[in-house]
Structures are given as structure tokens and as C-alpha cells.
Amino acid sequence: MRNFSLSYVEKYAPSRQQIKTYLLKKYLKQSISSVKKQNIIDLIDVVLSDLEKTKFISDKFYSDSKAKNLIQRGTSINKIRNYLISKGIQDRYIKETINKINENNEDQDFFSAIKICKKKRIGPSRTEVNRPLFYKKDISLLARNGFDFETSKKVMDLKKDDYLKIINLL
């Protein structure tokens, strides 16, 4: 079991919960009649605690690295929070990561929304003629990406010149 978990860690750099799910699926598929399910779960917990002691897995590191990666892609803070929750990261690590993001950049959502606009070619990156036609559609796209209404409106109301200046800074 330790070998399976080490190969999985080497390949994917997962969170604790992801390894636990992987090992449960792997060993419950085999359905060995002589071994009870509770024994498998206990063994998995022992392997996971051993991996944490040897620093092969760390939910804090996972949380920080995934958040950094998602920010570079232009993901909102709400979406990052929900992603980390879905991966089984503890609340304290999520709060630390979000606080670290806010310390580094006060208005991170604004810059992430700008990145989304550039990538999807919406909002201020559209031609001036088409912007009013697609306003609602663009606002809803930003909302689906986890941005609040104020941030979306602030980005959508940017002038083309200001938008280009910000893009050059990013």
C-alpha cells in the first residue's frame, strides 16, 4: 500500500484526501474476503500519517501551490476556495492561503477578472461597438467564474486605454 501511495504522490502531488480516496478505491475493488473494510481504512490512515511525517504530502503546501497556480490562470478567490474545499483541504489551510493571497495583492479578483477578459476576449477587450451588445453575456461569464457583481462591473466599465495599460503591467 505504501508503494502505491508513493507512486501516486510522485505522479500527481495530491492532497491527503485525494490519496485516501485513491487507496480506498484501489483496495476496495480487490474485495479480498479475509480482510475487513475497517482494517483497510485503518491501514490507509497509518500510511497517510507516515507520509505526512516524512513530508511527502502536506495539505498546507498543496493549498498554497494550487492557489498560486489557479491565480496565474485568472481564477477568482471564491473559485479557489471552492476548489480547495472539494479537494478535502482543511479550513485552516484554506484561510491561511486566502489571507496570503490578500496580503500579496489587495485586489486580486480584479486582476484575475482582467486575465479572464483577455483570455476569453470579453468586456474591455471587445471592440467598442460590440461592448454594449454583449454586456450581460460578459457579466454572466464573469459571475460563472466566481467574481462578484462589483468586481465584474468594475472590469466591464473600464475604458479600452486603461485596460491596455493594466494588461501591459500583467
Where are the language model's segments positioned?
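An alpha-helical, amphipathic repeat domain used for nucleic-acid recognition
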Residues: 1-170
